[in-house]
Design a protein with these regions (language model features):
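Selected transmembrane alpha-helices and immediately adjacent juxtamembrane segments
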Residues: 1-42, 124-174
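Structural signature of hydrophobic alpha-helical transmembrane segments
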Residues: 9-10, 40-57, 101-111, 140-150, ...
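A helix-boundary/kink motif common to multi-pass secondary transporters
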Residues: 32, 44, 99, 103, ...
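Small-residue-rich segments of transmembrane alpha-helices in multi-pass membrane proteins
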Residues: 37-46, 81-90, 114, 135-147, ...
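Juxtamembrane helix-boundary/capping and inter-helix hinge elements in multi-pass membrane proteins
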Residues: 41-45, 67-73, 161-169, 192-196
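Hydrophobic core positions of alpha-helical segments in small-molecule transporters
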Residues: 51-54, 79-83, 106-109, 172-176, ...
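Selective hydrophobic functional segments
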Residues: 51-100, 183-227
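Transmembrane helix exit motif
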Residues: 62-69, 92, 97, 106-130, ...
Length: 251
């Protein structure tokens, strides 16, 4: 795969998703974002999209399996899932066509916009809109962004900020949303050769180390307060946004 041999890629996937798993264990999201950011140092963004999908799917399956009140989450957030799946089924077929630079630019710009609005003290949780409408709107945005970049946590985060949920509920629900989105993305990526058969062995290695990292991150998360939790999210997103925008315009 590109200029890397098997050992190199197994090593890169192991280290990358161990780090990504720790971040996901602490803040509930961030595994695909971290994975993409690190992998893009070694492979092009389109290849990174394919390698990213299997660790993302397995880690979020594990995250939702360990969630509280899974049936209640499914019932409460069903409209978000319907919306995200519908849009992902469309957008995931175009990831290979738009090019590596545009993938980086779209994602980095969206993340930076989110960080800026939060830094200006816009209180998302004070927005009063019917929840069903919010679910369809943010589910659709997640689907549009996620199919192209494989990174759909940003609209999910804004939606859950509006809901002003606890850190534990944030982790449980975001895991459910991302897991449900993985299935249509898998179909789109596999059909367009973004995800190839060769990638599965590397993806499974990444998934294994992501679960180890996730376990460690969970232990750290237990002592984090809600305000600190949100600050960690913003710091994390700022770093990723700058990196992706730089890649889009200067690589």
């Amino acid at each position: 795969m590109e200029h890397l041999n098997n050992f190199d890629l197994f090593t890169i996937m192991s280290v990358t998703y161990f780090i990504a798993g720790i971040i996901k264990g602490i803040i509930g999201i961030g595994l695909p974002t971290t994975g993409m950011a690190i992998l893009c140092f070694f492979v092009n963004p389109i290849t990174a999209l394919g390698l990213n999908l299997i660790p993302m799917t397995i880690s979020n399956l594990w995250q939702f399996y360990r969630a509280d009140n899974r049936l209640q989450i499914i019932k409460e957030y069903k409209f978000f899932v319907i919306s995200i799946i519908g849009f992902l089924l469309i957008s995931s077929f175009f990831a290979a066509k738009i090019g590596n630079q545009l993938v980086s630019a779209i994602f980095g710009s969206m993340v930076l916009l989110f960080v800026i609005t939060n830094s200006l003290s816009i209180k998302f949780e004070k927005i009063k809109v019917n929840d069903v409408k919010l679910q369809f709107v943010f589910g659709g945005l997640s689907g549009l962004i996620g199919g192209i970049t494989s990174l759909w946590a940003l609209p999910i985060t804004i939606y859950l900020f509006i809901k002003d949920v606890s850190p534990k509920h944030f982790v449980d629900v975001s895991g459910f949303f991302i897991l449900m989105g993985c299935f249509p993305v898998f179909l789109g990526y596999y059909s367009t050769d973004v995800l190839s058969n060769e990638m599965f062995k590397y993806g499974l290695m990444g998934a294994l180390f992501s679960l180890i990292g996730f376990y460690i991150g969970e232990k750290i998360r237990g002592g984090i307060k809600k305000d600190l939790f949100k600050k960690l999210l913003l710091i994390f997103f700022t770093f990723i946004a700058i990196k992706m925008i730089f890649d889009a315009f200067f690589k």
